[in-house]
Amino acid sequence: VMPNTPAQIRKGISAWTASKEVDQATLDFVSNMLRAIGDELKFGDEKSIDIATAVSGSGPGYVYVFIEALAEAGVELGLPVHMAQHLASQTVLGSAALQRESGKHPAELRNMVTSPGGTTSSGLAALESGGFRATIADAVHAAFERGEELAGGK
């Protein structure tokens, strides 16, 4: 089982697997227990758990860096620290909740908030030119590779 730190407030996600010998009653018990600390996803193999660890186990760290950077930019532009941090964290929380509750693909929601030639469009262009997507992918790959090293190169 690989939970993540938001499990501390029952908002986590746990990736887990079990051998084929485990009976359904035990699988149901584990699933229910994990749902007490958030969501859960059962995977069929250990490699998927290692990938999930790189995405969601390490993911809170990536999100916190994004919140820090977003808030720091607000402070640089003149907002008080506490207001910039509140804006940044609530924006991440609300955006994630909207995506989950709407069931829409993140790209669809991004397109809905982006007006041609508008402020979001300019900001997104800066993210893309700065290699934001590639940097996130690099972080996930680095975490996955480090996990394999720590596990002895599975």
Question: Model-derived features: where do they sit?
Answer:
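Alpha/beta catalytic cores of group-transfer enzymes, especially the acyltransferase/condensing modules
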Residues: 6-7, 102
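Gly/Ser/Thr-rich beta-alpha loop segments that engage phosphate groups in nucleotides
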Residues: 6, 14, 56-63, 119-120
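Internal alpha-helical scaffold of NAD(P)-dependent oxidoreductase catalytic cores
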Residues: 13-51, 64-101, 146
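A short glycine-threonine-serine/GTX helix/turn-capping micro-motif
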Residues: 50-61, 110
